[in-house]
Amino acid sequence: MLDSDARLASDLSLAVMRLARQLRFRNPQSPVSLSQLSALTTLANEGAMTPGALAIRERVRPPSMTRVIASLADMGFVDREPHPVDGRQVLVSVSQSGAELVKAARRARQEWLVERLMTLNSDKRDILRNAADLILELIDESP
């Protein structure tokens, strides 16, 4: 590994962490944690799935996801129903109030980020657009 690659990895990691922190603070009155919001967003985007599938998608251990789902269910943000094929399983889906929470959180983050992006010229916004695609590619391809 070249020193420049190590520096890029360090700089990129720091930038992503700082951006995540800024986005996290855009909706401080949210009743859910970031891990709960992430699980809700996945369910809203991808539809109902088993807790095990959601744990894999969120890259957490199944017991951790079980706790996340239980707390979201207690707050009324997810619904659980029997699996149509495997009676031992349940399917978890986002409830109406959970979907509204995801939309509100997404809107708050997007409003802040659009405001910040508009301070950049179009060339810099294009660079960020390409970088976002590359970051997602890196994440999706990682084990």
Curated annotation (Swiss-Prot):
SMART domains: HTH_MARR (SM00347). InterPro entries: HTH-type_Bedaq_tolerance, HTH_MarR-typ, Tscrpt_reg_MarR-type_CS, WH-like_DNA-bd_sf, WH_DNA-bd_sf. One of its GO terms (molecular function) is DNA-binding transcription factor activity. PROSITE patterns: HTH_MARR_1, HTH_MARR_2. Residues 5-137 form the HTH marR-type domain. Keywords: DNA-binding, Transcription, Transcription regulation. Residues 51-74 bind DNA. The keyword Transcription regulation applies. Homodimer. This is Uncharacterized HTH-type transcriptional regulator ML2140.
